[in-house]
Amino acid sequence: MSKRKSPHDFLFREELGHGSYSTVYRVVERSSQHQYAIKICSKRHIIGENKVKYVTIEKNTLNLLGQANHPGIIKLYYTFHDQENLYFVMDLAPGGELLQLLRRQRVFSEAWARHYMCQLVDTVEYIHSMGVIHRDLKPENVLLDKEGRLMIADFGAAYTVGQSDAGSDGDKPATSFVGTAEYVSPELLLENKSYYSSDVWALGCMLYQFLQGTPPFRGQNEMETFEQIVNLDYTWRIPANPLAAGLVSKILVLDPSQRYTLEQIKKHKWFSGVDWNNKEKIWRGSWTIASESTPRPRVGYKSRELLDTPIKNIPVVTQRNKKPTKMNTTSSIVEWRKMLGLSGNDLGIKATLGGNGLPIAPFTPTSGITPDNRGDNAVAPAKTRDAFRPMSSRVISSPHSKPSGRPAALPLPLQTGTPSHNVVQQIVVNTPGRTETSSPYVSPTVPVRNAIWKQDWVQLHEIPYSAKYSGLTLAGFSQVSDTLIADLISHHANELRTLSRTGILSLDNTGYLSFIEQGRARPLSRIIDPDLSIYEYQLGHSTEDDFLILEKYKQSIWIVWPNKPTSASRRIPIKETWAQTLSKYKKQVSDEEELSAKLNRTCVSSWGSRTPSPTYPAEGKTRVAVQPQDIPLPSPAKSSSNSGVSEPISKIPPRQLVSASEQSHKAKSEAHTKKANSYSYIAPNDMVLSSSRYEVLRTASNNDSKSNGAAVSGASAAFRTLRVNK
């Protein structure tokens, strides 16, 4: 008998992905040098998030299904635990997720779609023969081995027939809400029940997705998606083989008793050339049937550093929820059923399950639902069911709905080459007793190689400002602080990832930060906006765990974190974090503006007839003529005896826009004017101007100031790094 495994028996390589309650790594067993995938579940997380049930179900189901070594089931080799984590050692899937392959290909050729459907049908047939309903079939839960063969994974939502949630009453179907919105069966929505036929429904959705590139039912939010499902509201955007479309129409049927069974699917004309008894041919690798239209994708791992560190140092509790959290769909289904007034068996449908996984009592269609009796070649049109139309006028729209996938391609940079200077028109400056026209002002330009400073895939969640909220919440905020930000992210990281949207964050050469989602760019703010503050929060030990927080004063907070791109080349630049890029940009703009200010500064001589040239603020601001007597001279800073660093002189508020005419009313008496004109005012060397409302002026200690007068950069809240050591 082999000894019990432990984390120290494996070398941890790169991270492969995240689930709703786990993190997966590629590992190498030290003794055999065999590669596996290891799923690590934080005990604290699964207990705190009530995931113990899902972890237990997955382990028991994999042990049950692993008895026959079916090629379509991911195999569980070892399970063990330590004080902090649970560990599942499983088959490695070098080909990644089927969803990733589909996104790269956009659509599958008919040959590939048929081949994958054969393997799915054969695997689901085996799963059902073992008395198991998967209940969350989707391309994201289907993995590929190195030869391109499918392996169904993620059995955390599975239900074993004969084992109710209470451990008895084996003749009842599953009655808990699980699954993903776009693949949820209508009987789960309308009856609160899942059958074997519910998995068949998901297969129909997947076949449609193979040929069209997207699921058949996808609304602006989950509520709208549910309405499309119960109305069979889907269309074919791309021409498809009528036989394949006809098969989909036989599977996507509202009545589960009228829906095609797996046996009927196998006998359909679209599979006429398939020998279902020839398992070797069915389970050959998909790369062997690659055609010119669907080239073989590259399989392999990006080279990463070996993680040969103690397991306790691996940040497994950092969840980014690449897969949607099931509880999110659950709450949406509950809300949707409440809106329709559905609960229990309101539709009068018996819940008794027969041996074939279908209800014993035939399903009686509700008003507006008719069985689909069309032929094989017919395509199901969109139906209208007035019985369930309350949703049409009460669809709940969520501005934070998470998109199902990334845009098809990364937008190209807006322009290339070094941008030219921006020349501002001449402006008229009104001064007491005289009017002058200033010379054209050339705004400082940040020297960049391309128009795009940085762009990368991110997840983004926006929190609007509202005085009705106390502090900082996911729904709104009225105040912000380091502590509030740290508490929100550390305690609500999973909710943030569920509510977030996937897109591209882009910073152009003009300093505008934009969020690009589904081909549409939305400007967020200019980096040098005085009302913008920037924070950085690191939840784990990797730069991939960094959260970027952008706060627009009394407007919005944007919480941003990386979403790993499929190719590192899509990052601009590749190695810089967002915090590093923004900090570099602000510093460069500040240096340029300081140099420009020195060049444009005009000293006022004793000639009283001459007016000073106006001082210009940053590009994009209203330019104001400022009299020298209006410029306050800083008082000497008092040095702290303890720290040796001077206290801030003052806190700079947001700049106010003041017209030249209003400024002229502030003119002092003639005596003060003459006195002001008798000397040249130059800003002291130790004054630090800020572009953030949180930045403050600091001066050097008395000793340093006397010795060299060097400027000391102020302590800025614009970039704070909050590191949580777990």
Curated annotation (Swiss-Prot):
SMART domains: S_TKc. Pfam families: PH_PKH3_C, Pkinase. Gene3D superfamilies: Phosphorylase Kinase, domain 1 (3.30.200.20), Transferase(Phosphotransferase) domain 1 (1.10.510.10). Keywords: ATP-binding, Kinase, Nucleotide-binding, Serine/threonine-protein kinase, Transferase. Its EC number is 2.7.11.1. Residues 10-271 form the Protein kinase domain. One of its GO terms (molecular function) is protein serine/threonine kinase activity. Residues 663-673 have a biased composition (Basic and acidic residues). ATP binds at L16, G17, H18, G19, S20, Y21, S22, T23, V24, K39. SUPFAM superfamilies: Protein kinase-like (PK-like) (SSF56112). Residues 629-679 are annotated as: Disordered. Serine/threonine-protein kinase. This is Serine/threonine-protein kinase PKH3. It comes from Eremothecium gossypii (strain ATCC 10895 / CBS 109.51 / FGSC 9923 / NRRL Y-1056) (Yeast).
